[in-house]
Amino acid sequence: MAGLPDRDKLIRNFSRCLNWEEKYLYIIELGGQLAPLTEQQRHPENLISGCQSQVWIAMTLSAEGHVIFAGDSDAAIVKGLVAVVFILYHDLTPQQIVSLDVRPFFADLALSQHLTPSRSQGLEAMIRAIRTKVADLSAH
């Protein structure tokens, strides 16, 4: 997560944006800070179904048992949403991720109201897929 802000800084930066155009640009900027995926990480098993755009999310466990995320999308705003989700789940264990409901966070940022229905559905699909895959990750 090199380069991405922590959760508190994300909230501060988001609140400094004067309008939704600036907020969208900030989200896109966050997506641009994600490290590129390897060809191996772009494997079909990492492709998230339920998203209108192509979204890949790869997860591994650190030696400390925290989930390490890598992700990408072919749509800039979606790639930014991937980055926001990674910020929220940063440094958590699989059990913590499964039990953490991040939807209220998106509601607090008013993101839910300002995304198109297809983007909102895609965001929900991403969160569901992460929680499902992370449960499998901890089982192995």
UniProtKB/Swiss-Prot annotation:
Cellular component terms (Gene Ontology): cytoplasm
Active site location: C51
Gene Ontology BP, a term: sulfur compound metabolic process
Pathway: Cofactor biosynthesis; iron-sulfur cluster biosynthesis
Keywords: Cytoplasm
Keyword hit for Transit peptide: no
SUPFAM superfamilies with a match to the protein in the record: SufE/NifU (SSF82649)
Gene3D superfamilies for this protein: 3.90.1010.10
Membership in a protein family: Belongs to the SufE family.
PANTHER family: CYSTEINE DESULFURATION PROTEIN SUFE, SULFUR ACCEPTOR PROTEIN CSDE
Record's subunit section: Homodimer. Interacts with SufS.
Protein name per UniProt: Cysteine desulfuration protein SufE
